Amino acid sequence: MKNFLSTSFALSLLFIAGCKNNTTQELVQEAVSPPNAKELMSKSAERLIGLWASGDANMVAGEFTDDAIRVISNPNGAIVGGEAILESFKQTFSEGSDFNNSKIEVGIVETRFVSDDIMIGAGTFKISDTDSVVIESGKWGNVYRYADGDIKFLLESAHATHDLAQITTKEMPSIESSIVSEQLHFEKVQASVANYIKHANAGDAAALAMLFTQDGIQNVASKDGIVMGREQIKSTTTFSEGQVLNANLLGYMDLGNSLAIAWGNWMQVDSASNTSLRGQWGNLFEIKGDTAYVLMESAGRVK
């Protein structure tokens, strides 16, 4: 009988210890579970939709980090820093603005974490007035910083779709010189931009696609939708004879973890028709060895 009681007591202790170990393991698993990119993006989009409808510039600007950048094919250039971003939204929602009392719809095509604290996403947007008439629509490819269980815009690179006939011009505007920076990996990103121009003007789709990471994202005005991966980027890239691309690099930020964002302007001249198009770009790069690969390209045309 004593042996039975001793054995039962020992088994009970083992059972309790086992339960504790299982509980501890579950708690540890919960603690280290990676954040869900899709859920975070959906919540961010829902907040933006609600805050946009409220017309509260301060609240919308609060969705951006203090050092964020907006590249939105604005003729005046990129909008850099929290104060400038707040002012841009005050103008957006001001009386007399086309966007006053407007609403925004956001479509999400792709989202993923690229480091512990950096997330990217790409998709579509549509802005309508109170009568549901579309004011503006287009595509976006944004970079977000993750902190305290949520994400904020670090780089908004969103570009409206325009009719080519409305934005093609006979003017041949000059493109300003690129910046020079001593920040880490800047020269690699600078080389990537130069190679993009080189391969585009050579009409080499294969070489251009190799400038991207294997799972790179391309969101550009010249293509429908969001293009995913090198193979699709290559197969959807076409060139027209007589078109010459030029671009500059006007801003750069090293993000650590072999990631960097950069932005600038581009211009394309058609020598046959003597016309030009211009726009802006805001991209995310991943540095591997001596090369900066495009992890996400997001570029659009300026009206």
Enumerate the language-model features and the residues they cover:
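A solvent-exposed, acidic/Ser-Thr-rich amphipathic alpha-helical stretch
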Residues: 35, 39-40, 44, 57-117, ...
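A short hydrophobic beta-strand element
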Residues: 116-125, 257-266
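Short, low-complexity N-terminal intrinsically disordered segments enriched in polar/charged residues
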Residues: 19-62, 162-206, 210
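Bacterial N-terminal signal peptides
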Residues: 8-15
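Hydrophobic/aromatic beta-strand elements that line small-molecule binding cavities or substrate pockets
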Residues: 85, 89, 106-111, 124-127, ...
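Short beta-strand edge/turn micro-motifs at domain boundaries
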Residues: 24-26, 135-170, 278-303
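Bacterial N-terminal signal peptides that target proteins for export
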Residues: 1-8
